[in-house]
Amino acid sequence: MEKLARKQVQQLTPYLSARRIGGTGDVWLNANESPFNNEYKTDFARLNRYSECQPKELISAYAAYAGVKPEQTLTSRGADEGIELLIRAFCEPGEDAILYCPPTYGMYGISAETIGVERKTVPLTSDWQLELAGIEANLDNVKLVFVCSPNNPTGNLVKREDIVSLLEMTKDRAIVVMDEAYIDFCPEASTVDLLAQYPNLAILRTLSKAFALAGLRCGFTLANEELINVLLKVIAPYPVPVPVAEIATQALSEAGLARAKFQVLDLNANRAYLQVGLSMIPVLEVFEGWGNYLLVKFPDGDGLFKAAWETGIILRNSPIENCVRISVGNRDECEKTLGFIRNYYA
């Protein structure tokens, strides 16, 4: 059966999500999920009918939240589908390329590889910023440049002036895709205001993080209307199930937004608690984080990761040497994790 698969698929290594890696324990800080399990109501009516391709109430609610027009908003099965839609819509397999800057989110490369589109990489600088000269030197045949801010797994914000420089550099050449999956934890850093000035900008968003709806799989792409219309040509006819649209719309109601804002404040406080506590352990290097996670460099990252795993504290190993990413949980989970690490290095 393997030989019947496309060559790209035969050679593909699937993305190792936190759920694929698994683990057993009672402290799960490996997938940047929210610790809040909010309740929603749905009557499961109309399940005998297909959903709208783009549910109007949901689109209007998210557009209002994001500060854009409904015509600039597309909803999909998580931001991951948005990545795939952009590549399918704008890249010719075997001709065009995408570009991204590791260390960063792995699905940009995997989505391109699955579709048969070339992947170009320009590593981030030593302080996790864009290497603009390297990007410019590699723009031939590039249709999409993916930038994650706050970046996963490093946690930092990409400098706004560098994003503007990149948008100027790629005018009439490529689309800059800003992955803002974690922007709700620092909304002042969003690039949504640049949409009016740059038609080559697309922004990915999700309800998985700050809205505590990772299991719902609901994401958004924000862009100018012309770009959105291109994506509507390739999206599945019924991408958002009826219950998903109903729950997502509730999350974006006045009450839902107030709850999300409160929970973001709580998680940001827990992140600060973790950051201060870990920074007091002399052998650790704690990188400043703006999402719901922190990247920490240990003397022996693999050893710490395995020891935590064995005690039921599930963290996320990183491709960066000796670095482990720690999701921000509730205060009890943060205290347990900090206590374990302190004892490990005592």
Swiss-Prot record:
Documented EC number(s): 2.6.1.9
Origin superkingdom: Bacteria
Pathway: Amino-acid biosynthesis; L-histidine biosynthesis; L-histidine from 5-phospho-alpha-D-ribose 1-diphosphate: step 7/9
SUPFAM superfamilies reported for this sequence: PLP-dependent transferases
Catalytic activity: L-histidinol phosphate + 2-oxoglutarate = 3-(imidazol-4-yl)-2-oxopropyl phosphate + L-glutamate
NCBIfam families in UniProt: hisC (TIGR01141)
Designated name of the protein: Histidinol-phosphate aminotransferase
